[in-house]
Amino acid sequence: MSILKEIYEYKIDFVNKQKKLHTQSDILSKLKNITSHDFSFSKKLKDEMSRTSIIGELKRASPSLGNFVNEEINLSNIAQIYEECGVSCLSVLTDEKYFKGGIEDLIEIRKISTLPILRKDFIVDEYQIYES
């Protein structure tokens, strides 16, 4: 089996389990209580065309680098440092199996940062979009 097929099958199974824990209806009802902000990733990059834009990546592991893992890393602290240093946007890896992240990382970063955030994951279902 190819690695992409393996990832796809794993992610389909994982998302189906998540749907049983938190239904899409539950997620949509929570979204109604969220205050709207302008977190447009593409708009932020276009607005800063006069300077080099940097996207700060936040991840706990990297399979391409020999699968180093640092699950104890404080992503919120790193996000704050990135913001203080002037990054334009943030990218948060939320894949559990391969990058040791989670949707909780995305939620935590959103609480402390006003920058646009990209959820970086293997997206296989619209459920994940609403979850983001």
Where are these regions (language model features)?
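Catalytic cores of alpha/beta
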Residues: 124-131
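Conserved N-terminal beta1-alpha1 strand-loop-helix module at the mouth
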Residues: 1-117
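Short beta-strand elements of ligand-binding domains
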Residues: 119-121
